[in-house]
Amino acid sequence: RHYLRRDAREAMRGTKTGPLTSALEVLRDMRDPIRQLVERGLLSQDQYLDFFLRWFNSLNDFLSIGPPALRIDQLQALLGAGIITILPPGMQIKGIDGQFLLKTPSDPSFSVQAKSLLEARVPAVNAPTAQNALIQQLLHDGYAHTYELQLNADKRFQSGAIAVDRQTQQLLDANEHPQPGLFFWGVPTEGVHWLTTASPRPLVNDTSLKTAEQIVQTIWEV
C-alpha cells in the first residue's frame, strides 16, 4: 500500500512538476524512434524476441503505461476496507471439492479458497486462438497467416500476430504475397508492429494517424 500511495502521489504531480513522472515521460517520447527500430528490422530475429518482446516490452509497460491516479486511489480504498487482497507472486490454482484453492510457493503459509474464479488478465495477441470469425476464416482460407520469427539454430517462433506488409499494411497470404484491398492494422498485428494499443498523442505526428492516412492513400492508388 505504501507503493500505491507513492505511485498516486507522483502521478498527481504530473509530467511538468513531478521529477519521476517527467523522467518516465521520456519513454513515451521515445516511442516513435523505437517503432522505427522495429519497423526497419534493425534487430536480429533473436534480439527482437529475447531482448525486445520478452524483456524491454514488459519493462516499458510497467514504467510508462498504467491506470489513472484515481484508479490507484480506489484500489487503496478497497485494500484498506479488506475487500481486495493482493496475492503473493507465483500464484497456483487447483480445483478441490468444487472450489478453487489458491496457493503460492513464495509464501507456504498463504492459502485462499473461493467458489468463483474470474480470469481478468488481458490475453496476449494470438490469431490462431482468436474468437473473431473473420480472422479464423482468413487463416483457414489461406488469405492470412501468422508472423513467424526465424531464430538461430533453425528454430522458429510463432508470434501470434497477423502478418502484414510493414510498409503498406496489406495482408500477407499464406505464400507471403501482399493482397490488394485487404489491410490489417492495430491489435491483431501486435508483434509485427509495436504498441498498437497506444492512443494518439497531441501535438506530434502520431504513428497511428499517419498509418491510417497511408492506408487510405494506398486504397485510392489501387
Task: Tell what function each PLM region has.
Residues R1-W220:
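Flavin (primarily FAD) cofactor-binding/catalytic cores of flavoenzymes
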